[in-house]
């Protein structure tokens, strides 16, 4: 909750709402896959889930920061176009970061022993889901809520 308050102040309440729904998506999908794989939830899984939340939130904040930066820099384009451009600009960074993290976590999975396998498996699932949500869920949700429920003081008023 403290992180969502930070995002709401740093960016906007719609950014916070989009990121919270994306984080909820990440945790629930990861838990669902762990349930399907019959992996027991223990302290290492809880630690992995918290790591996933931090990792996914970091990815989302990078995208949101680029959106905010481009909103100030690019005048005249539609908000939807600016969000799309921002996602395209951060896509390379997001994919490369996720790929390199997956390499390290894969080493943990294969060589870490039985204790670290469930932790590493949870991270692998969570990184894939978190990367997906930071690109395809958080920003579109932010845009949707901004368009559907605009803040009254920011609506253009006709004279």
What are these regions (language model features)?
Residues 1-10:
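Selective detector of the "anchor" transmembrane alpha-helix that sits immediately C-terminal
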Residues 11-16, 43, 79, 115:
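Membrane-helix interface segments
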Residues 15-68, 125:
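Hydrophobic transmembrane alpha-helices and their membrane-interface caps
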Residues 19, 76-111, 121, 127, ...:
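Pore- and gate-forming transmembrane helices of large, multi-pass membrane proteins
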Residues 46-66, 92, 96-104, 132-139:
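Transmembrane alpha-helix detector for multi-pass membrane proteins
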Residues 69-88, 92, 139-159:
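Terminal, Lys/Arg-rich, intrinsically disordered segments and adjacent short helical elements
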Residues 111-159:
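Hydrophobic alpha-helical transmembrane segments of membrane transport and translocation systems
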């Amino acid at each position: 909750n403290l992180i969502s308050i930070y995002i709401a102040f740093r960016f906007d309440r719609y950014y916070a709402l989009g990121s919270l729904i994306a984080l909820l998506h990440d945790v629930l999908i990861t838990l669902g896959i762990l349930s399907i794989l019959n992996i027991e939830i223990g302290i290492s899984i809880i630690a992995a889930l918290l790591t996933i939340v931090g990792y996914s939130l970091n990815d989302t904040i990078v995208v949101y920061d680029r959106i905010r930066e481009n909103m100030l820099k690019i005048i005249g384009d539609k908000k939807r176009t600016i969000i799309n451009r921002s996602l395209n600009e951060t896509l390379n960074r997001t994919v490369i970061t996720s790929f390199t993290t997956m390499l390290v976590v894969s080493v943990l999975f294969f060589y870490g022993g039985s204790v670290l396998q469930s932790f590493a498996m949870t991270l692998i699932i969570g990184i894939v889901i978190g990367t997906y949500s930071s690109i395809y869920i958080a920003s579109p949700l932010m845009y949707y809520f901004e368009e559907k429920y605009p803040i009254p003081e920011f609506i253009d008023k006709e004279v």
